[in-house]
Amino acid sequence: MFLTNISCLIIPILLAVAFLTLVERKILGYMQLRKGPNIVGPYGLLQPIADAIKLFTKEPLRPLTSSKLLFTIAPTLALSLALTLWIPLPMPHPLANLNLGMLFILAMSSLAVYSILWSGWASNSKYALIGALRAVAQTISYEVTLAIILLHSNLFSGSYSLSSLITTQEHIWLIIPSWPLTMMWFISTLAETNRAPFDLTEGESELVSGFNVEYAAGPFALFFLAEYANIMMMNALTTTIFLGPTYNPTFPELYSTNFMLKTTMLTISFLWIRASYPRFRYDQLMHLLWKNFLPLTLALCMWHTSLLISLTSIPPQT
């Protein structure tokens, strides 16, 4: 039964990820006044299936000087962690309703750093290693603000469980009282998932595609799937924390529809940003976090904490 539950979670995610690649190529195409994929199947709808067949039937080449074990483990670990992150998300019922769901997501997203680092180091290529070090520095840095903003949402909901956020947002979305945090969270999720304009790990001109430069065929496809699964997961988490869909026990399907629509809109905005903005310089990326986001999030954290303490002695207005 448990295996059925897991497969019912994993298969739709992988299908959504496959078609997200098509949506991205279509959006980028239309924004550049061209069609995008339109040959394979009607309107190019079978393009993801053709891509999957092509990638998984090619021979997975490996550099002779690479570390065989780590080179193989890294993409598998990346996809496994990307799928594990979906476990505590309420849609409206999570696969496992964890009391510390927020901390679980934070810990799992931190572990994703290892797959990037191992892939860069095991490739035994200086381009891959520099790309991996960039990615690790960027991911670890932006996790700081993500953790502080998660602490804010914990202050609002009074629990580390993600399911409690549904109850918290019955009357008002958290985006309204905490819109500066939401903006910083959204930009931090862009950086955390290595998306444009923060995709410095893939600097084609200087790093030749970054940490996955030596990967081909199946292992490359696993990294690709992990990246897009992380994008969708981060947007699903943003929806849960700041745009809480209304849960009606008599119509639980409405929650799922609402949740999926909001997640889709946020994901399309990710793609829109990629098509619109140029890449940041590395020092600008780090200055944005350490000199702007970190002081702001800490100040807002102190403000929200002190606000709760200062209002505790005030009687309720009945």
UniProtKB/Swiss-Prot annotation:
Give TM segment ranges. Answer: 2-22, 36-56, 69-89, 100-120, 130-152, 171-191, 217-237, 254-273, 294-314
Q: Which UniProt keywords apply?
A: Electron transport, Membrane, Mitochondrion, Mitochondrion inner membrane, NAD, Respiratory chain, Translocase, Transmembrane, Transmembrane helix, Transport, Ubiquinone
Pfam families assigned to the protein according to its UniProt record, in alphabetical order? NADHdh
Give this protein's Gene Ontology molecular function annotations: NADH dehydrogenase (ubiquinone) activity
What kind of membrane protein is this, topologically? Multi-pass membrane protein
What EC number(s) does its UniProt record assign? 7.1.1.2
The cellular location(s) given in this protein's UniProt record come to: Mitochondrion inner membrane
Catalytic activity entry:
a ubiquinone + NADH + 5 H(+)(in) = a ubiquinol + NAD(+) + 4 H(+)(out)
Which Gene Ontology cellular component annotation is one that this UniProt entry carries? mitochondrial inner membrane
Q: Name one GO biological process term.
A: aerobic respiration
Chief location category: mitochondrion
Q: Can the keyword Lipid metabolism be found in this entry's annotation?
A: no
Q: Which PROSITE patterns match?
A: COMPLEX1_ND1_1, COMPLEX1_ND1_2
Function comment: Core subunit of the mitochondrial membrane respiratory chain NADH dehydrogenase (Complex I) that is believed to belong to the minimal assembly required for catalysis. Complex I functions in the transfer of electrons from NADH to the respiratory chain. The immediate electron acceptor for the enzyme is believed to be ubiquinone.
Belongs to which family?
Belongs to the complex I subunit 1 family.
- Protein name stated in the entry: NADH-ubiquinone oxidoreductase chain 1
Q: Which organism is it from?
A: Cyclopes didactylus (Silky anteater)
What gene is it encoded by?
MT-ND1
